Design a protein with these regions (language model features):
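A conserved regulatory-domain signal marking ACT and ACT-like small-molecule sensing domains
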Residues: 149-175
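Acidic-aromatic/histidine active-site loop/patch
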Residues: 131
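Terminal amphipathic helices with adjacent charged low-complexity linkers/tails
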Residues: 1-6, 91, 140-157
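A broad, low-specificity signal marking well-ordered, structured residues that form hydrophobic/aromatic
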Residues: 42-43, 58, 138, 151, ...
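Flexible, glycine/charged-enriched surface loops at secondary-structure junctions
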Residues: 123-126, 137-146, 166
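Short, charged low-complexity intrinsically disordered segments located at boundaries
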Residues: 64-67, 142-145, 160
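Nucleotide/pyrophosphate-binding catalytic subdomain
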Residues: 1-128
Length: 175
């Protein structure tokens, strides 16, 4: 991941922040795809790190593993990005607090972004944008229950009127 993800400094970041919480370029990279195509049909790599402008190591900060998977998926125009975690996907509410919460098996990118940004911890909000821009689906799956359907996030999900999910963040009110 470090050799493939190039950190981008933001103008307002101090030197310390340029190493500890970076963003990366994620526009499709045919040269990178060609370089990696000679290997296995599936890319499995560590997440969370990138290469800084001076060649050193930079980290992607909170949610960096999800985000690096999304960056690589977008760069490579992958068929999908899989996020394996401790729950089977995104739910209509926090299943640890609401026993009747429903697994949301299909969401569009905007719905997933809203749910992730307002408190769902299963997926970091930053990882959705690169996949949405590249039209790469995100699959969320459960490491303990791989047979479960999980959640698919893509541009083909039907958006229906009404409430899909309820989420919360302490100290924040969104109206």
């Amino acid at each position: 991941a470090r050799e493939s993800l190039q950190a981008q400094s933001l103008p307002n970041q101090n030197e310390w922040s340029q190493r500890l919480s970076v963003s990366c370029r994620y526009l499709r990279d045919p040269a990178l795809a060609e370089r990696l195509s000679t290997g296995a049909p599936m890319l499995i790599t560590q997440g969370f790190i990138a290469r800084s402008e001076d060649g050193g190591t930079a980290i992607l900060g909170r949610g960096g593993s999800d985000t690096s998977a999304a960056y690589l998926g977008a760069l490579l125009q992958a068929r999908r990005v899989e996020i394996w975690t401790d729950v089977p996907g995104m739910f209509s509410a926090n299943p640890r607090q609401v026993p009747d919460a429903r697994l949301l098996t299909r969401l569009d990118y905007e719905e997933a972004q809203e749910i992730a940004s307002t408190g769902a911890k299963v997926l970091h909000p930053r990882c959705i944008h690169p996949c949405r821009e590249a039209r790469v689906p995100i699959w969320i799956r459960d490491t303990e229950r791989p047979h479960m359907a999980g959640t698919v996030i893509d541009h083909r999900a039907a958006t229906l009127a009404g409430v899909k999910a309820i989420s919360s963040r302490r100290g924040i009110v969104l109206v």
